[in-house]
Amino acid sequence: MKNRILPILFILFFILPVQAKREPDLYKKADSQRMEHWVDSVFDSMSVKERIGQLFVLAVDVNTSAKNKELIRKYVEEYKVGGLLFTSGDVQKQAELTNYAQSLAKIPLMITMDGEWGLAMRLKNTTKFPINMTLGAIRNDSLIYAYGKEMGRQCRRMGIQVNFAP
């Protein structure tokens, strides 16, 4: 009996947990290879200055003035930044500036925001979500999931890839 229990315990405690931690395949192998090839070819074509610039995300005001557009141009074309973090403003101006910045970039920019309460934390006339302390008190996981999904949908519509929200 002991001889049968040890292999079963080994499987339960060592093999099954390893299998449970496997990441799901989000992309097909062909897609992954194509993406890696593109990334490698772009990276190999970059200068040291461009590679260093990709490490930086710089804050920009949501203001469509000529002075602000010149600042964005300088960040993108001269400093070769990897992304921008837009501060307060309105939806239309941010969309305009995002499109402007992306049009200048040799490599697509990572557009970010600091919006713990959703877009309303930085952009006027958008949906304001509850603060995180309130969310912590909610005992309905499906509601929290729906909250996160909606916040992600709104960010995606604005071209925001990263929301620095805990």
Tell me what each language-model feature is:
Residues 31-64:
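Mature N-terminal segment immediately following signal peptide/propeptide cleavage
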Residues 4-5, 46-48, 71-77:
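Short, flexible, solvent-exposed loop/turn segments with mixed acidic/basic and small polar residues
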